[in-house]
Amino acid sequence: MEKIFSSSDFDFFTPGLSELELPLAGEIACGFPSPADDFLQESLDVNKLLVRHPDATFYAVARGTSLAPLVQPGSILVIDRSLEWSSDLLACCFIDGEFTAKWIEKSGDKIRLIPLNPDFPTLEYSPEEAEIYIWGIVTSIINNNVRLSRLQ
């Protein structure tokens, strides 16, 4: 990955699109336990899984907690700039010179930016109040900071 830009909320990178196929061990039960597979089924290339439009895809490393617990500081957001935005998508937005990621919702002539963390307010803007640019749509979130104890 090559760093291309930093803001107060994100570091942006271009994806490294080298192929790396890893063994896919089949499915794992997250409900009731199931018998384990006795063999590996196939392989998986993470870039092919996460990047649908290579020329329009960027990674951003999150800072801040407005999307916690889904997105934590250090989470990697996969952002596709080729996708059209619509309400109820997680978007990377550029507002008054800063990037932020929030769920977006159009309400009349206003745009609402909705955090997941209840400690943060929903932001609502009309075209007169702020210049908002939907920079891209978050298509995947990579959390490499999984805690080994249960979430509380």
Task: Please place each PLM-identified region on the residue numbering.
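Short, compositionally biased
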Residues: T65-A68, L89-A101, E105-I111
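Short, hydrophobic/aromatic-rich segments at coil-to-beta transitions
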Residues: T57, S86-L90
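Short, positionally conserved secondary-structure boundary motifs
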Residues: M1-L67, S140-Q152
